[in-house]
């Protein structure tokens, strides 16, 4: 991979550290405020979800219309300045309002930066190296995911929320610099022309028409969205692991094994060919991992099901994005990516809502999910 690809991977890692610092610090600080904090935390999380649903479709349009490099620089700079500003607030009431406001602004920024970040890859990485890039990026992000909670805990334990916000601002500024040194001339930027509100909705419609008529792309979105639905339900079940298995620390063990599975998956993903048949194979194998967790096996053997599941899900995710980045025309890439993100955000609360509707959480729920995944796989085949 070239130097620019390394810069983008570094930006992804830096942003991941900053986001985990921000979410951990804010959530712990709000939760420490008792009943009021619980209510505010709910508003904090819901505001992010709703904003993401509303902004994602527009983010794809902007990504296809304008310089993706400038979009990333702008969002990083805005978020960095915002975190820096609120880090100096000392009044708790003002801090609560500022955190909610900042969370909404960051959700808007991420709605624009996510599709731009995935789409710009095709401008700086050779087509045949995209799967390798995605695998390396996922490996770095998974390692950061394992290490960041410990780092976040130490920062909050020995410093304060204000220091957490300052560090988060620093990560945004570093990300800004990394993007600023990418090539200034993108491989393909649309001609500069007048851009109105009507054009936004026209572009969204054109993007949806493109997805509908490109059957292979439509199939990819269908598979990715359905997997997001099933695994949102799966993630809802995991916090109940201690009670389901009757083992203290089961949840932490399952998460640790899942992280190991993700890292291993990222290591081998670029060794596999990217094709529709491979995606369906990965999907059914991920389901096998879920199935293992529902079997009456010794606890730690059941826990290993999450290692299997995350191993194949990670490879699946890498190859889904590789397929999208290599098959979608550059003029539509941002809109296709934003559609994936929008559907993912939409399906997550639906899946979790269905799980709360169930009369009880039982081990059989894992088996039921595997049955659903297998049925979906059979229908696609």
Feature roles, as predicted:
Residues 119, 123, 161, 165, ...:
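Helix-loop junctions on the cytosolic side of multi-pass membrane transporters
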Residues 7-24, 44-61, 67-82, 98-156, ...:
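Substrate-agnostic recognition of the 12-TM MFS/MFS-like secondary transporter fold
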Residues 88-102, 294-306:
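Helix-loop junctions at membrane interfaces in 12-TM secondary transporters
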Residues 1-2, 185-221:
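Juxtamembrane intracellular "pre-TM" segments in multi-pass secondary transporters
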Residues 13, 161-163, 203-264:
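A single, central transmembrane helix in multi-pass transporters
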């Amino acid at each position: 991979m070239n130097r620019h690809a390394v810069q983008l991977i570094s930006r992804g890692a830096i942003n991941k550290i900053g986001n985990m610092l921000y979410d951990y610090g804010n959530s712990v600080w709000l939760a420490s405020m008792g009943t009021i904090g619980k209510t505010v935390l709910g508003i904090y999380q819901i505001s992010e979800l709703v904003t993401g649903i509303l902004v994602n479709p527009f983010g794809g349009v902007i990504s296809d219309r304008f310089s993706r490099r400038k979009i990333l620089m702008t969002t990083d700079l805005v978020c960095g300045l915002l975190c820096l500003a609120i880090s100096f607030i000392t009044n708790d009431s003002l801090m609560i309002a500022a955190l909610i406001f900042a969370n909404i602004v960051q959700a808007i920024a991420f709605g624009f930066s996510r599709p731009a970040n995935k789409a710009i890859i095709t401008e700086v990485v050779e087509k045949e190296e995209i799967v390798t890039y995605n695998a390396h990026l996922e490996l770095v992000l998974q390692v950061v995911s394992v290490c960041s909670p410990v780092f976040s805990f130490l920062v909050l334990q020995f410093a304060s929320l204000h220091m957490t916000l300052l560090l988060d601002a620093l990560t945004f500024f570093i990300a800004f610099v990394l993007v600023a040194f990418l090539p200034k001339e993108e491989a393909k930027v649309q001609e500069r022309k007048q851009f109105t509100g009507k054009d936004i909705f026209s572009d969204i419609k054109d993007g949806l028409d493109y997805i509908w008529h490109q059957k292979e792309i439509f199939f990819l979105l269908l598979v990715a969205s359905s997997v997001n639905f099933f695994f949102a339900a799966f993630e809802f079940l995991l916090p109940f692991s201690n009670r389901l298995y009757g083992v203290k620390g089961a949840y932490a063990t399952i998460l640790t094994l899942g992280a190991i599975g993700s890292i291993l998956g990222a290591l081998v993903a670029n060794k596999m060919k990217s094709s529709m048949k491979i995606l369906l194979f990965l999907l059914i194998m991920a389901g096998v991992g879920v199935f293992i967790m529902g079997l009456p096996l010794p606890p730690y053997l059941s826990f290993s099901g999450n290692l299997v599941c995350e191993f194949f899900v990670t490879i699946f995710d890498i190859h889904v994005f590789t397929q999208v980045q290599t098959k979608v025309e550059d003029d539509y890439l941002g809109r296709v990516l934003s559609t994936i993100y929008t559907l993912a955000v939409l399906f997550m609360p639906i899946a979790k809502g269905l799980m709360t509707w169930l009369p009880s959480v039982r081990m059989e729920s894992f088996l039921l999910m595997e049955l659903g995944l297998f049925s979906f796989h059979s229908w696609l085949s």
